[in-house]
C-alpha cells in the first residue's frame, strides 16, 4: 500500500494469515482501509498519453470493491472472499466521522429510517464552534461509529469465551479524525480554553516552502482542493479542534474500557495481550497547521504505543525507537510463530523491560498520489529519524529538512542549508541510503542457483 487509493494485492500474505494458519480465530472490527473506500478519481493523477500497455504490472483481475460505498447500498448482503487478508470475521467500517459506511452504514440506515436527516448538515445541533470541518452531529452516542465498533468487539469477545481456540481481534476506530464531530456529551466535554497553541507559525525560524504555501493560502483565504489537505488555522480554531479531538479520544477510551471489562467478565483478561496504538498523528496546531501532509513533524509520526501483557502488567516506559512495521513481528513472536520470509519489521519484545534498546533509527516513507502543500511534484518523501536528528528528503524538490532534536525538540529551526550541520547531514544521508537498501524485497526467495 504505497498511498491512499491502492489496494493491498490479495496474493499478499499478512501476519494475520500466519495467526490464522496457527489456529487463531481472527477478526477485523472497524476501519480496515486495505482497499479503497471511496469511488472518486484521485487528483492530478490522470494519464493522458495513449499507451499500448498502461502499467508495469498486469492486473490480477480482482475488482477490489470490498470497501467501496456501492458494495453496501440498499442493505444488500456482502460476502467477503474469506479470509479477508487473514481475517476470518469482518465487521467493516469505511470512511470517517458521523457518516461512516460499510456494515456500520447498513446497520445505521436500517436502525434509523430518518438517517438522511441525521446526516444532513442542515440539522446540526446548536453550538458556538466555527473551526473548519466541525459538525455537532444529532446522531446519538450509542449509534456513533465508535460505539458500534465497541459493541461489535464486545460481542466478539463474549463469543470467543465460548470457543477453545485463541483469538486475535483487530479493533480499529476511525476517530480521532476530521470531520471533528464527537457526539453527545463528548462534544463539549472539553473547553477550548483548556488548550493552548504552544507552537505558533511564528515559532519557526525558517519555514519550509510547504509551510509557506499553507500560510499563503490562509492569508489569501483559499482552501484546499479536497478536505484532506492540511491548512493553517487561527489560534481560536486550533484550540476548538483540540477540544473536539480530545472528546473523540475520550469516547475511544471509554470503549477500550468496555473491552477490557468484557475480557475480565469472561475470565480472559489474564490470558490476553492488549496492544493500543495509532496509524499516525495530526499536526493539531503545530505551527498553526491542522490535518496532515508530507511534512513529517513529530506530531505526525509519534503515536501512542501500549503493550499490556499478562506476563507483566507493570507499567514501564521505554525511550527506544520503534516502527509500526515492528508490530507484526512482535505479535508473531508473542504467539510463538516464525515470521515469513520478506517481513521487514523486527520484534521489540526484548525491549519492553525498558533496559534493551530496540532501534537507534527509524525509516519513515511517504508517498502520495497528488501534489500538496505547494510542492512541484507528487510527494515522495524519505525520512530518517534518530533520537538526535530528523532528516527528510523530498524527491525533485530543491529543499529538505534537517533538525537537531537534542537542541531543538520542537523542530523550529531547519538546518538543511546550515554549513555547520553539513557533517551531520552527510552522515544521516548515508544512513538513509543504507536503510533504503535494506528495504529491498527478499520475497520470493530464489529457487535456483541461476
What does each model-identified segment do?
Residues 441-450:
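Short, charged, surface-exposed hinge/linker loops at domain edges
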Residues 1-394, 399-400, 410-430, 444:
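Formylglycine-dependent sulfatase
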Residues 435-441:
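Mixed-charge, Lys/Arg-enriched low-complexity segments
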